[in-house]
Amino acid sequence: MSRRNATSFVDNNTLTSSGISGSGSMSPPITSRPASGQASPLTSNGSLSPPQYADDQGSVSYNLDSPRDLSPLLLSELACLNMREVVARPGLGTIGRQIPVKSNFFAMDLKNPKMVVIQYHVEIHHPGCRKLDKDEMRIIFWKAVSDHPNIFHNKFALAYDGAHQLYTVARLEFPDDQGSVRLDCEASLPKDNRDRTRCAISIQNVGPVLLEMQRTRTNNLDERVLTPIQILDIICRQSLTCPLLKNSANFYTWKSSCYRIPTAAGQALDLEGGKEMWTGFFSSAHIASNYRPLLNIDVAHTAFYKTRITVLQFMCDVLNERTSKPNRNNPRGPGGPGGPGGYRGGRGGGRGGSYGNFGNRGPPGANVRDDFGGNGLTFTMDTLSRDTQLSSFETRIFGDAIRGMKIRAAHRPNAIRVYKVNSLQLPADKLMFQGIDEEGRQVVCSVADYFSEKYGPLKYPKLPCLHVGPPTRNIFLPMEHCLIDSPQKYNKKMSEKQTSAIIKAAAVDATQREDRIKQLAAQASFGTDPFLKEFGVAVSSQMIQTTARVIQPPPIMFGGNNRSVNPVVFPKDGSWTMDNQTLYMPATCRSYSMIALVDPRDQTSLQTFCQSLTMKATAMGMNFPRWPDLVKYGRSKEDVCTLFTEIADEYRVTNTVCDCIIVVLQSKNSDIYMTVKEQSDIVHGIMSQCVLMKNVSRPTPATCANIVLKLNMKMGGINSRIVADKITNKYLVDQPTMVVGIDVTHPTQAEMRMNMPSVAAIVANVDLLPQSYGANVKVQKKCRESVVYLLDAIRERIITFYRHTKQKPARIIVYRDGVSEGQFSEVLREEIQSIRTACLAIAEDFRPPITYIVVQKRHHARIFCKYQNDMVGKAKNVPPGTTVDTGIVSPEGFDFYLCSHYGVQGTSRPARYHVLLDECKFTADEIQSITYGMCHTYGRCTRSVSIPTPVYYADLVATRARCHVKRKLGLADNNDCDTNSRSSTLASLLNVRTGSGKGKKSYAPSVDDESYSLSDATSDQILQDCVSVATDFKSRMYFI
């Protein structure tokens, strides 16, 4: 199926140079000029990738090759930058159609506006050395309250946060009028190996606190006083967290959400695999306009482990979910059994236990399933027998699932003890340990024999034991004597099916969500809450109402090659159509190849797909080859690496260029997908596009159009642009503007134990529209929010902008994602200084004004239309462009809510924007219009998106880079790592320097300091190399 002869489609051999067209270089692909009648907005000759231009700005000289040394005067100026002042709101926005809306905030009224509460510091002392969780500290505290009525006269006049803070309506009377007291109590804690534990509580008087909301008023980010609103937050949660109230036993509190514990079947959504979805409500106190306290209430959904089930039932649920069908697509294959002493077996094999071989198959005829993950059997409690044992594959699956969970040991009557599971071990009849008999002699016996003597014979002696408790102690329990501790939140990664089930259950239309929130507020019974009553706090039963404005969307311009249609289209309900339109600036694909990870007998479908794709690309104005030059078949991720190398070598031999490799996947497989992207982005520097076989077999025009949109952008083209209005023309067109998107992704708790770093992505436009973007990626120490190496990235982005447009940016607009309000001061101070330093490092007089905007997506504010006529779509959401800057916004600073997308499913979540720095002096209308316009430039679809495009792209880049790092660290999607391998993963190389200094515990696999010692610089460089894409890719949109 080469362009010369379609019958050569299945030929895997190297084609001759005559069968591949190209210029013979590996330079970026050629991009065509704009459609006829349109001048190029980038350069005079229409090129998207101009050469390195000489400076034509007159007196300004740019140091583009190396950073310049800053003078002492400039360094002093940078040190004195004031990044602490809050940007004042420049006024309220006025443009747009006004509509009345409601939001899920409820007014809070204080009986005494200047009420004073007494603050105390609480320390809880436990005789053991373990750390207490908040649930345990609440049990101990409230038990002390019950045991000492002479100190706590009114238990409802207390507000305890579950840690170290206590607030009271009146001063507590301590003996001898002391400022502190130590109280003893006996509490029943499930994790202790006794019925009751004697604990002590130290309470120290800190002083009075004035509950006046305007105490938070300050123009300095570092001086904001949050205590009053935090106290109201604690007070509102007391009824559901105080164990002295019977109703609290029906709820479980996790951070700011309270979930109702299911008490009967059907009250929770079954997610399979021993998990279920609980429903609860989120609540958080805020200070809004005019310093009015509001309570934000929202519906909350999350996954928990099933309640009241045994570990055996949990095992059945997990294995039935993961091994219900023969695992023929398992990329690891069956592998071998686990090796002794905890080392892995063959590739894909089970992991051995700490004391021997997991993979023992047992005698012939034993009730054991094959290593491929199942033979059609289903695990149930009825099918388990004395001879039941697990295969090495099943052992690995269940071991990964139960590791880290809390279980209850129930082998002792009337004594329930809670343990944390470290790992699975050998079956009970084979796991041996040393003990002392009644006569004081040392004996060696199996766990099965020990339990048989002490508590009766085991029903399932061939099932693995659980290693629980401190990792250094040998505490082993048979699974049949264990229960799943509940309530217990599920914190691991869920499968796509489970995630989809939660989204489907939670995605209700706006009117239904509004009703649910009202029901939750009513069920909370704030009107009869004894704690609120004692503190003099009242919560309204009605949602806050305010006025919103619906901003008009910008028109969208396509190419003008098709004169029969108007190239300008107008979005309606957040979307627009490309019918009969051509790309605004189509790119040229000179040649491409294909890797098909499907059956070679599907050749006909692949041929049809290639024809359909070429026809659609041509119709959209893109020059695209009729057939791929090379087509190669494979099955596994190892084949992907081999085939990428073969294709690159063949083009290199023929001195031609491959602009893109299309990879056809049989089904979604993240491991194979990331192998493709690693080979594409880092190893070979050839653009790639993955397509699922189900889309290849049915290449509809819409499917082909979506693929063309991605390919065009990856090869340097522009799909469409917004038509500049007065505001956009002033700030984005008349003067060159660089729009930057920054996002930082952090590792999960499981990934942190494997030394997974944080990943920062910096994206900025390389044209004047802005539509085309380049990206930089930086890795840094885990969980640090501010971007450490931002200076280098911004400097490179400015230089790239200049070389592509021949103009320096006259202003810089930064959209920053993922920053909480408590981090505003730190991030703003460090990142603005880095951006300013990057500008001065290029030229001393290069000082473009900077506007820095934080974009927040993870909040619980929702906006509902008051009248049905204003609702849009089946989900009855607010219309795209809905903007709110009154009523529910902050009383200080410059923030607003903007719902820029059309909610197809569920209730739309508006994005919240905080303008932390505005040297460009935007008005409210200007910044809101520009932000809304930037939500219409996302190239992968013909819809407006929920956040500005630069931030969206930064998130894509960070996600891609994070996957590259995980692959190098040997982490799979479930965050499992081969901790016994010392040379196969980067984690072992980084163990010495990452997280092990200054008394911190290192969680990486242990290595010998002398043989593996690396400097911090070397560690950082290794991590950076993991995400360093090909040089040409840094100014191209490879991440689309």
From Swiss-Prot:
The Polar residues compositionally biased stretches are: 1-15, 33-50
Domain of life where this protein originates: Eukaryota
User: Care to name a GO molecular-function term for this sequence?
Assistant: single-stranded RNA binding
Record-annotated PAZ domain positions: 379-486
Q: Which GO terms describe its biological process?
A: regulatory ncRNA-mediated post-transcriptional gene silencing; spermatogenesis
Chain ranges of the Piwi domain: 660-966
Check the record and name the InterPro entries matching this protein: ArgoL1, ArgoL2, Argonaute_Mid_dom, Argonaute_N, PAZ_dom, PAZ_dom_sf, Piwi, Piwi_ago-like
Specify the protein name. Answer: Putative protein tag-76
Q: Which organism is it from?
A: Caenorhabditis elegans
